[in-house]
Amino acid sequence: MKKNYYEMEVSSKNASELFKNFSFELGVEAIEEKENSFIIRDEEDLQNLEFAFIEFQKALQKKFNTKIDLQISKSIKENADWIEKYQKSVEPIEVGKFYVRPSWKESKKELIDIIIDPAIAFGSGHHESTNMCLKLIDKYAKDGATALDVGCGSGILSIALKKIGLKVAACDTDIQAVDASIKNAQKNGVKIDKIWNGSIADANLAIRNMDGEILSENLNENKNFNQSFNKEFDFVIANIITDVILILQNELKNSVKSGGILIISGILEKYKNKILNVFSDMNNLEILQNGEWVSFVFKKG
């Protein structure tokens, strides 16, 4: 073990989840999530990682034609067994009927157990937007219904939906997130019914099973998927940044059955009215707010 290690704290007011996901694409194996940032530690210099984040910021700004906030601070610290220290600092959380915990913590018998290890996941339930999503799943998701998780990340929301009896489809534009969702579902003893790498409109691309194997290159060839979901869902949830929600607004609306529920989360308070305006053709049932983060519940028809 080297005498010192490097620490980098990364924060973004409007793209935190994207930078977290990108860190795993770069090969980062563990992060520590804080309220408004995340920390990366390594015994090797993190200069190349910093450069990659800055280039990723530029790419996001070009793609979404908007300013992407990014703050990076670095330090050198005396080495210690920080992985063990970090694990001890991660506490389970109770959200409605769900109990989200890392694998090294004990379960609670009276609650629905969800195991997510922050070291390998893009979301562990501690972030305000994910926390609100779990509360809304607890309240609005119905046993036997069909669900779509858009931007599944760690798979935490898909796992919650499966554990209360829904048929679940999930997608993410990041292949690392798809793989993480598959692994986390296996760890939790559930199977996401169908999962693909891409957005809502890419459901006709390669479909993966829980072993990560491609089932079909064409969704229309998969009769079980079509019979179960018909491309419209009783319950759709999207916990992603505002800019992506705005890009996907029509696809999100079209993916909800008449009388179905759409949950939008990952939205900063300053974009609250914009989201309400964009989805004004749906019935707004509820708005939750936790700190600067806002979640919306809409009903179609």
From Swiss-Prot:
EC number(s) per entry: 2.1.1.-
Catalytic function, reaction form: L-lysyl-[protein] + 3 S-adenosyl-L-methionine = N(6),N(6),N(6)-trimethyl-L-lysyl-[protein] + 3 S-adenosyl-L-homocysteine + 3 H(+)
Signal peptide coordinates: none
GO cellular component: cytoplasm
Function summary: Methylates ribosomal protein L11.
Record-stated family: Belongs to the methyltransferase superfamily. PrmA family.
Name of this protein: Ribosomal protein L11 methyltransferase
Species, as recorded: Campylobacter hominis (strain ATCC BAA-381 / DSM 21671 / CCUG 45161 / LMG 19568 / NCTC 13146 / CH001A)
